[in-house]
């Protein structure tokens, strides 16, 4: 079993479905091509075991992150990237995850405050 994301014309994920294993051909077509047939979407396989470029089961990470609705597929990075949570946050190229411009304190619960560009203790 594998998971497939459907991308609109802006490469934004509109849905994610379960399908046949990616190593199988269906009617002579690779699975991404097969599932895209008859739709206005581009289909890209995604792995629910991959987050931040790491495979949770120790396997090979795939496309940096599991695709979710609203994520963007970046063809240059071959990665799924979440929407940017705050204007000041920066994309980590290695993980394709967004990070605050200031490191979060390690102890306690903190919320990001975009107005002050700092962490506020909860």
Tell where the protein language model's regions lie, with residue ranges.
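Interaction-interface detector
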Residues: 1-122
